[in-house]
């Protein structure tokens, strides 16, 4: 069984037992969270689409860790003008383990 969930402005296809890095959510490590914005649920050849969400569907997950992604370096330069600008960014994430999918 799989589901398509929406969290942090992005959509993810998940199945039970998968680990996933999503945008940071305020939750303690080891706590169980419920992701209730389920867009689709499928099993085998059957697929249940929401309009826009599937009624009564939820995905239960456990928070494994909180962290930060690798640094992304931004470099701007104007040729012949001696203008150079360096900037870096590290995005926070939450790693979750999908426990069950309730449809």
From Swiss-Prot:
Keywords: Ribonucleoprotein, Ribosomal protein, RNA-binding, rRNA-binding. GO terms for biological process: translation. GO terms for cellular component: cytoplasm; ribonucleoprotein complex; ribosome. It holds the Pfam family Ribosomal_L21p. GO terms for molecular function: rRNA binding; structural constituent of ribosome. It comes from the Bacteria. The keyword Cytoplasm does not apply. InterPro entries: bL21-like, bL21-like_sf, Ribosomal_bL21, Ribosomal_bL21_CS. SUPFAM superfamilies: L21p-like (SSF141091). PROSITE patterns: RIBOSOMAL_L21. Coiled coil: none annotated. NCBIfam families: L21. Belongs to the bacterial ribosomal protein bL21 family. Part of the 50S ribosomal subunit. Contacts protein L20. This protein binds to 23S rRNA in the presence of protein L20. This is Large ribosomal subunit protein bL21. The lineage of its organism: Bacteria, Pseudomonadati, Pseudomonadota, Betaproteobacteria, Burkholderiales.
